[in-house]
Regions:
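C-terminal "lid/loop" region of Rossmann-like NAD(P)-dependent oxidoreductases
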Residues: 64-69, 98-99, 107-114, 121-140, ...
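Amphipathic terminal alpha-helices
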Residues: 160-175
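Core catalytic loop region at the nicotinamide-binding pocket of NAD(P)H-dependent oxidoreductases
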Residues: 60-65, 89-101, 124-126, 175
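Catalytic tyrosine of NAD(P)H-dependent dehydrogenase/reductases that use a Tyr as the general acid/base
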Residues: 2-5, 74
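NAD(P)-dependent short-chain dehydrogenase/reductase
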Residues: 14-75, 79-90, 104-109, 113-120
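Active-site helix of classical SDR
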Residues: 8-11
């Protein structure tokens, strides 16, 4: 693991498995990849960019988006789909198993930003802020959800473009 967050996730999975094996606790572990949507905290990249766009549209900031590394690839899924996946994991998942939850589609942070910029009529400059560059960042995170799909039949229903539109609209209503 490259971060303390990743270490904590591995520890949680190990504890869940041990409680399942040792005490028969019906644990089902889910590894939800990036999940996004309205009400997402502004410290997360999608929400942070959407908030900056909304603030620029409202005249609260210059038309400049401050960014970090745009080359990283992530698997973004709408949080509303992820909540359905959690429910199905409880209903249909096999105790003791681990399931990946995501779209299975990788998009760069740049692609996500371009999508948001395409939803505004403003001409917004993109500026790299060195303070936003992470010292240890995983370059590629894309889920293989075939095991979860086979167990539950789940697949995402909300298009990424709709998720980003809803997220930007959320921030437009709040700035």
């Amino acid at each position: 693991p490259l971060s303390t967050y990743a270490v904590s996730k591995v520890a949680q999975e190990t504890l869940a498995f041990q409680y399942h094996r040792s005490y028969g606790l019906r644990t089902v572990v889910t590894r939800a990849f990036n999940h996004e949507g309205p009400r997402r905290g502004h410290v997360m990249v999608t929400s942070n960019f959407a908030r900056q766009v909304a603030e620029a549209e409202a005249g609260l900031r210059p038309p400049v988006i401050e960014v970090g590394d745009l080359s990283s690839v992530r698997d973004w899924t709408d949080v509303r789909d992820v909540v359905k996946a959690y429910w199905l994991a409880l209903e249909r998942g096999t105790p003791g198993e681990v399931y990946n939850i995501g779209s299975g589609v990788g998009r760069s942070v740049r692609e996500m930003l371009d999508l948001l910029l395409g939803l505004t009529s403003l001409d917004i400059e993109v500026r790299v802020d060195p303070a936003r560059l992470r010292p240890s960042d995983v370059k590629l995170l894309v889920a293989d959800c075939s095991k979860f799909h086979a167990a539950t039949g789940w697949q995402p229903e909300i298009a990424f473009e709709q998720t980003m539109r809803d997220l930007l609209d959320y921030w437009r209503q709040r700035v």
